[in-house]
Amino acid sequence: MKNELICYKQMPVWTKDNLPQMFQEKHNTKVGTWGKLTVLKGKLKFYELTENGDVIAEHIFTPESHIPFVEPQAWHRVEALSDDLECTLGFYCKKEDYFSKKYNTTAIHGDVVDAAKIISPCKVLDLGCGQGRNSLYLSLLGYDVTSWDHNENSIAFLNETKEKENLNISTALYDINAANIQENYDFIVSTVVFMFLNRERVPSIIKNMKEHTNVGGYNLIVAAMSTDDVPCPLPFSFTFAENELKEYYKDWEFLEYNENMGELHKTDENGNRIKMKFATMLARKK
C-alpha cells in the first residue's frame, strides 16, 4: 500500500528557529493524506496524540531513524530536540488523489479508477476529457492517452499540467458531435459528457466509438438519464432513457451495467449536490 503513495507537496527544509508553530501544536493530516517526516540533521521529537491532545506515544527521530508515514487524520505534534535540527515534511496520497490534491481539480471518476484495476495499460481515448482528470490519472499509470474536448481552456489546462508532470498525453480540440474518430483504441472513456451532446447525433457517435474500438477493447460510459420515475432535473440536451445505452451495446460483453442514482458536482440553490439517475457501463467488444 505505501508503495502506491506519491508525493504531491514537499515542504522546505526547516530548522529549530523556523519550524512552523502549527506543527508544534496538536494537528492532523487531511483525509487521504499521509505525512512523511525526514530528519536531515539533529533530533526531532514526535508525539502521537488523541483528539483531546493526550500523549499516546513519544518518538525521537534522527537522520538514522526509519520514520513511518503519519497516517491520514492522525493527531500529532513535533518538537525540536537539538539546536542543529534540519527537517522536512512531504505530503503523500494515492495516485487517484494526486491531481485533485496538487492542482485542486475535480476528483477522478470512481468508475475510471475501478476500470484501471482490470484493464492493463493500453491505448486510450478520453472523449470529452474536460481539464483531464481521467486522462492525467491514466497517463500516470502508464496508459497511452489521447484526450479530446471542445473547450479550449480545458485543453490548455491539461496541456499545462501534462508539461509540469512530464506526462505524454496527445490532446486536441474536437467536437464529439462530429462522430469522426479515425484511429482505433483499446479503451474509450466518456464520463459525464453525453448530456451535452446533440440528441440526433448520439446514434452516430456511439456507432463511431464502437467501430474504432479494437476487438477485446473496452468502452466506459457514465451518462445522465431521464426516466418516468426519475425525470432529469436539469435541461440537458441529451439524456438516456431506461435500458437505452444497454441496447446500443447489446452485441458487446457487459462487465458492468447499472442505472443508479448519483450526484453531480453542481449544487442546487440550497448548496446540495444535484441528484439524478446515471447509466454506468463498462463493456468489452467481442
From Swiss-Prot:
InterPro entries with a match to the protein in the record: DUF1971, RmlC-like_jellyroll, SAM-dependent_MTases_sf, TehB-like_dom, Tellurite-R_MeTrfase_TehB, Tellurite-R_TehB-2
Name of protein: Probable S-adenosyl-L-methionine-dependent methyltransferase TehB
Enzyme Commission code: 2.1.1.-
Family: Belongs to the TehB family.
Its biological purpose: Probable S-adenosyl-L-methionine-dependent methyltransferase. Plays a role in both resistance to oxidative damage and heme uptake/utilization. Also protects H.influenzae from tellurite exposure in vitro; however, since H.influenzae grows only in humans, it is unlikely to encounter tellurite in its natural environment, and it is thus probable that tellurite resistance does not represent a biologically relevant role of TehB.
A biological process term (GO) from this entry: methylation
EC class name: transferase
Gene designation per UniProt: tehB
Cited SUPFAM superfamilies: Clavaminate synthase-like (SSF51197), S-adenosyl-L-methionine-dependent methyltransferases (SSF53335)
Induction: Transcription is significantly up-regulated during growth in iron/heme-restricted conditions.
Residues at which S-adenosyl-L-methionine binds: 128, 133, 149, 175-176, 191
Keywords per UniProt: Methyltransferase, S-adenosyl-L-methionine, Transferase
Cellular component GO terms, alphabetical: cytoplasm
Family matches, as Pfam families: DUF1971, TehB
UniProt-listed Gene3D superfamilies: Jelly Rolls, Vaccinia Virus protein VP39
Record GO terms (molecular function): methyltransferase activity; S-adenosylmethionine-dependent methyltransferase activity
